[in-house]
């Protein structure tokens, strides 16, 4: 690695740390003014952003699962602006009293929410994340260091240029947001920046997340990878099931809350053809186990139906592909989920309250659903505003990582001259 590159990044990280200390002095109204100004400038600057995005898209195959994630258009930019306005409208997550008490000696204790400080994000070809992360980080009083994928470098730099312009116009340091150089080595420097970055959140493939977890010295929160199951129970309502499965698989197949494996009770194999019929209209390729394959053979398009191999279970497809697993009991379904789940989002379709209760109790995932689509795993859908990612771990945060999850806390203690006895 070039020492010049490493030294340049380290010096810049020191400047980001300095900028982070000024953010705690900002009022929520000032932060909201910045966010609303940014949201209002997206449309006037859309041409430059979309031109940069097109240059990124030209280097990527349309068949790539990443293509849809990389794509920006006017409609998506409008949605991003709306999300930023929504973040501005949310209550501040800072200086919230989490706990309060007065001790017998008269000391008054208050536990309150405070910013993390400097948050690092390593992500792949998702330029919308650049906007989302900045909005959430600023609202929660944090500075941000970004390492985007090289596939989206032009898009990210156009977006960051706009954000820096807005920050400068509000007399805030552009060092509040730092986009690392595109070189791969920059991520290595970032992951080793103990004392300069407080937390790193990787967003992307399981391979990316594993690499960051295994390499980073800075604390890491795992997000993103979703191996998502929906179990159609023997009491499941067919028409409801058709709509849920179709929505979970085809709404946006390239995102982490999309359905990967349909589990069906063996007593409902007779309904499998009807359950999957809408999927054929969307050209969904099904990898079915033997019993499911035989049930689908006469009705599902031959070119879209294949025998499942072991690797098809436990795969995050990120495309119009689906594996189907047949089980004989609820326990079998739960065991399959436990074996292959990434602990992101799991769902059951059932009319049996006992099955629903057991599923909620025993499935170990950040979000567990009954009789609805896993597509709802999203900070905005939860009423939290845009999220930085979906945490699939249990320490600090789990599920959508929105404003509160980007804060920590400190104890503030007031006294009247008390001293601790020897």
Swiss-Prot record:
The reply on keyword Cell membrane is no
- Which PROSITE patterns does the record match to this protein? PROA (PS01223)
UniProt cross-references to InterPro entries, sorted A to Z: Ald_DH/histidinol_DH (IPR016161), Ald_DH_C (IPR016163), Ald_DH_N (IPR016162), G-glutamylP_reductase_CS (IPR020593), Glu-5-SA_DH (IPR012134), GPR_dom (IPR000965)
Q: Where, by residue number, does the polypeptide cross the bilayer?
A: none
Domain of life per record: Bacteria
Query: What EC number(s) does its UniProt record assign?
Result: 1.2.1.41
Record pathway = Amino-acid biosynthesis; L-proline biosynthesis; L-glutamate 5-semialdehyde from L-glutamate: step 2/2
Q: GO CC terms on record?
A: cytoplasm
Q: Name one GO molecular function term.
A: glutamate-5-semialdehyde dehydrogenase activity
Swiss-Prot/TrEMBL keywords? Amino-acid biosynthesis, Cytoplasm, NADP, Oxidoreductase, Proline biosynthesis
Cellular compartments annotated = Cytoplasm
What's the catalysed reaction?
A: L-glutamate 5-semialdehyde + phosphate + NADP(+) = L-glutamyl 5-phosphate + NADPH + H(+)
- Is Iron-sulfur among this UniProt entry's keywords? no
List, in alphabetical order, the GO biological process terms annotated in this UniProt record.
L-proline biosynthetic process
The record describes the protein's role as:
Catalyzes the NADPH-dependent reduction of L-glutamate 5-phosphate into L-glutamate 5-semialdehyde and phosphate. The product spontaneously undergoes cyclization to form 1-pyrroline-5-carboxylate.
Which PANTHER family does the protein's record reference?
A: DELTA-1-PYRROLINE-5-CARBOXYLATE SYNTHASE (PTHR11063:SF8), GLUTAMATE SEMIALDEHYDE DEHYDROGENASE (PTHR11063)
Family statement: Belongs to the gamma-glutamyl phosphate reductase family.
- Identification of the protein by name: Gamma-glutamyl phosphate reductase
